[in-house]
A protein has these predicted regions:
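Alpha-helical cap/lid subdomain in secreted, periplasmic
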Residues: 1-119
């Protein structure tokens, strides 16, 4: 995130905002949904487990990224579906193949979450 320039395309916020605007210009009558990434962990080169919920790797934690995604969606009229806290959480390790990538059960939970949004 670049506080001085919210259109900075080298940031997640700036790139996401630009992408949303491009879709809105090209397809003005569609409703856009953004699905967040699910919770996950990974192991660094030293064998340390990185918890993306609390460990800042230099550009913020995953929660920072989620907040930037939510803000970009809010400012641009895009529906945001939270899978990070809403579908796959730190308790759902059986939904991940390697601590981060979804397995079949994880994909089904994401699909269920997506389906619930459309039923509302």
């Amino acid at each position: 995130y670049d506080e001085a320039n919210d259109k900075n395309l080298t940031t997640v916020y700036g790139a996401l905002t630009a992408t949303i605007k491009l879709f809105q210009e090209q397809c003005p009558h569609i409703r856009i949904y953004l699905l967040s990434q699910p919770y996950g962990t990974f192991t660094d080169a030293n064998g340390k487990t990185i918890d993306i919920d609390r460990d800042d790797l230099g550009n913020g934690t995953m929660v920072d990224y989620l907040n930037w995604e939510v803000e970009a969606c809010r400012k641009n009229g895009v529906s945001f579906i939270d899978n990070y806290y809403g579908a796959i959480t730190m308790e759902d390790t059986d939904c991940l193949t390697d601590g981060y990538h979804l397995n079949q059960k994880g994909r089904e939970k994401i699909a269920e979450r997506f389906g619930k949004v459309f039923k509302q």
